């Protein structure tokens, strides 16, 4: 199987999001990369489903809560920017203050 670098990145993010979900199920607080992966995966999958950019920007800020991350992680993440593929092309989605 030959994957482009972009496809490899998407698979890595999807796998990291799976690991993060399993850790949340066990009650383990997420670290920085895990929180980013969950938010990114949510946006990418929402884009593939055809959800509008504005909706993903708003909903992406409710994927991970302060109670689900390690101390100080929420303050470290100011914005999450995701280049996602929508039915009408690739767009940049920015989730401001993604952990509330």
Swiss-Prot record:
Q: Where is it localised? A: Cytoplasm
Q: Which residues cross the membrane?
A: none
Entry annotated with the keyword Ubl conjugation = no
Q: What is its EC number?
A: 3.5.1.5
Protein name as catalogued: Urease subunit gamma
* Catalytic reaction annotation: urea + 2 H2O + H(+) = hydrogencarbonate + 2 NH4(+)
Q: What is its main location?
A: cytoplasm
Picking any one GO biological process from the record gives: urea catabolic process
| GO MF annotation, one | urease activity
How is the subunit organization of this protein annotated in UniProt?
Heterotrimer of UreA (gamma), UreB (beta) and UreC (alpha) subunits. Three heterotrimers associate to form the active enzyme.
- Any coiled-coil ranges, and where? none
Q: Which domain of life is it from?
A: Bacteria
Q: In which pathway does it act?
A: Nitrogen metabolism; urea degradation; CO(2) and NH(3) from urea (urease route): step 1/1
Q: Which Gene Ontology cellular component terms are annotated? A: cytoplasm
Cytoplasm among keywords: yes
Q: Which HAMAP family does the entry mention?
A: Urease_gamma (MF_00739)
Q: What is the lineage of its organism?
A: Bacteria, Pseudomonadati, Pseudomonadota, Alphaproteobacteria, Hyphomicrobiales
Tell me its family.
Belongs to the urease gamma subunit family.
Q: Which keywords fit this entry according to its UniProt record?
A: Cytoplasm, Hydrolase
């Amino acid at each position: 199987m030959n994957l482009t670098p972009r496809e490899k990145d998407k698979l890595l993010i999807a796998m990291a999001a799976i690991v993060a979900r399993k850790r949340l199920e066990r009650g383990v607080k997420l670290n920085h990369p895990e929180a980013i992966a969950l938010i990114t995966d949510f946006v990418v999958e929402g884009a593939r489903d055809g959800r509008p950019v504005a909706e993903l920007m708003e909903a992406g800020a409710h994927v991970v809560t302060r109670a689900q991350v390690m101390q100080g992680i929420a303050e470290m993440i100011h914005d999450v920017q995701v280049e996602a593929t929508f039915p009408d092309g690739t767009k940049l989605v920015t989730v401001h203050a993604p952990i509330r």
